[in-house]
Amino acid sequence: MNWTEDFKDNSIYRIDESTRMIEIAFAKASETQIWKRPNKNSNSIGNLILHLCGNMTQYVIASLGEQEDKRKRDEEFETTNGLSKAELLSKLKKTVANVKSTIENASETQLLKKRSVQGFSFSGMGCVIHAVEHYSYHTGQIAFWAKQLTDQQLGFYDGMDLGINNKD
């Protein structure tokens, strides 16, 4: 395996892990709770999903995939309802599928090419790294807020022995 395939595989693995965790958190929260904000300066789970879709589309699908950037970032935070849990999850899954396809199909040239996103200069790899870490960061916020709203464990690793030591 060469470095580009390893980079792609590991990036997609992290995206899939975050998606799995978001699906678990979503299953615990009600339709009403999805749009509840902790306070006026914080985002609901619904807003975070819209924001993640916008960010991943901008950084991976548009930038790495060399498509037109049509993101309307402010709308991601201004929305207060109107989409159900099923609609939000469908939007997220479609975005993630497009992101994964874009990463899988990216050439070495695309991964190394410098580009401007939100006024920052990144290589294609930099765009993927940003999208993956940003997705993970907000996945943690979604998990925390779902646990706060429902007073339930999410059990991300139930049934797994996480005490196994690393081996070469």
What residues fall within each predicted segment?
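Extreme N-terminal tail/first-helix region
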Residues: M1-R14
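Short acidic-aromatic linear motifs embedded in glycine-rich loops, typified by GG[WY][YF]DAGD(H)
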Residues: D9-N10, D69-E87
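Short, contiguous alpha-helical
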Residues: I12-D16, E23, Q33-E75, V117-D168
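Hydrophobic alpha-helical core bundles mediating ligand binding, dimerization, or RNAP-core interactions
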Residues: I15, T19, F26, L92, ...
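Residues within well-ordered alpha-helical secondary structure of globular protein domains
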Residues: K28, H51-G54, K94
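Surface-exposed helix-capping loop/turn segments at secondary-structure junctions
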Residues: K28-W35, T102-L112, K147-Q153
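Acidic/histidine-rich alpha-helical segments that form the ligand environment
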Residues: T80-R115, M125-Y135
